[in-house]
Amino acid sequence: MDGIKLANVSKFYTVEKESIKVLNGIDLDIPANKITVILGRSGCGKTTLLRLVSGLESFDQGEIIGADSKRKAYVFQEDRLMPWLDVKSNITFGIHKKEIDHNRVDEIIETVGLKKFYNAYPSQLSGGMKQRVSIARAFAYDPDFIMMDEPFSALDYFTREQMQDELLRIHERLKCSILFVTHSIDEALVLGDKIIVLEKGIIKSQYEIEEKSNDRDLLDDKFVKLKKQIIDDLKVI
């Protein structure tokens, strides 16, 4: 499967009759079967870029190649579960009954560690468990690309680390292309095969990480230097 390519993509919003350019001339290759992370501070255009690639919003200039032919799923910051549905029903929600592969769904439920909560309702789940259901729902759709908009940002530190590990394990087992938005440099370094640093609507820098996620030590000199470079890119003091 091929990836997705953005060529000179720009996006404008009109606020009180004033045109504001949110994204400016974005050129980007999003590889298949990898985790590509869009990193930047709040308001830099991360979510807008994700929504353009997913087709939830239209762009004003440029071209996005290869996105229309892809099956895409979306994981939001909020879990967006249906409170009256149990875990399995939430995971299969939105999939046509004839298209549901129950064996695959059961495998995904086991993979995300929710086998014991098969018949549980959202009110009976912790925040981390709810996000596991959201991730499982995305993978159950059998997508080519999963768009993840800061899915772990509302979780506590320890649950967030656990969910990062879970995502890497699921990605390794089920194989899918992921476009992941975050404002956390450490999260980008843990998850990303490719990191896109976005600042004020433009791509400031791009980094590719060769080490497998399980082999990464953020205290290693290489990652310490890379983190410092990204901080410089973002002009964070």
Predicted regions and their residues:
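Conserved ABC ATPase "signature" region
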Residues: 100-117, 169
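Hydrophobic anchor residue at the start of the ABC signature
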Residues: 135
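Helix-to-loop junction immediately C-terminal to a conserved catalytic motif
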Residues: 54
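A short, proline-enriched helix->beta-strand linker immediately N-terminal to the Walker B motif
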Residues: 140-144
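Catalytic Walker B motif of ABC-type/P-loop ATPase nucleotide-binding domains
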Residues: 146-149
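Conserved ABC ATPase signature
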Residues: 121-125, 129
